[in-house]
Amino acid sequence: KTAPTGEKLDYVLIVTPNHVHFDPAYKAICAGIPVLCEKPITLNMDEAARLVKIVEEKKVPFCLAHTYLGHWTTRFSRHIVTSGLLGNIRWVDSSYLQGWLAKPLDVWRINPKTAGRSCCGGDIGTHALMQLRYVTGLDVTEVSAHLEIMVEGRPLDDHFTAYCKLSNGNGRALVRASQISIGHKNDLGIEVCGEKGTLVWKQEDPECVHIYLDGQPDRTYWRNNGITPNDGFLKDLPADLMAEPTIPSGHGEAFHDAFARLHRCFEADVRAYQAGKPFKCDGTKYANVRDGYVGMAFINACADSSEAKGAWTPMPTLP
């Protein structure tokens, strides 16, 4: 309403507590303005479903801020796993450990009115879920979960564990998150175990990807340092992955670089949208509105399972 005549917002960035995500996002999309929103996407499932509906009706770019998808090594990991180099995926351990809530603190994340049904699961468990889904290309179909309160008096969980069935049929995963693990700062990591080998990636050491193959020497691939196809493990590498701008190896990339890459990929779709050209917003470069719905479905399925003492609970799907 206060923008100068002839000017329009390129996109809206929403970095508020969870209960203030839906309203500005919905209004912006209705006005044809792209949105980059923090996760989890909304406070509840109904809001998430309504956002999916309006985004797909209006055909407006929408990005969910799963920043760690912006690491070049995360995208490299996705290529390795989804191209079948590890074989059929048997087991995934995706975890996010922190210690900042080990003592009583009065923060909005532990208030159900502002955070929703889960503190730890919604705040960082959704990141662990997104790493699992993005790197493997698999979905979670059922969960057996425990949302636990380790610091007495809290209304929401500060420790979160979900055992998961995966969409490839026989695959299983552990999605775990903790905010009471003293000594852990921002310890997001994923280990993918296939029938041919294992991949390990750590957010606190984001410059490299470790590969372990049965009967072969261990391999470590460093970002922008001589990664080439046909090396005895890697095959053809996607042109867009190899062309992705990175700084020289040894000049450390970290969170800010991942965040910048996420914005750059989203902004490319925003520019295309503004020019009336096709844009993808398909979840291959950044999380989209459907990924946001899946995150909310996961939180709710896990909360339901936990209330039923860990009973297997199916993941809700979009109506």
Mark where each language-model region is:
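Predominantly a Rossmann-like dinucleotide-binding segment in NAD(P)-dependent oxidoreductases
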Residues: P61, Y68-P155, F160, V209, ...
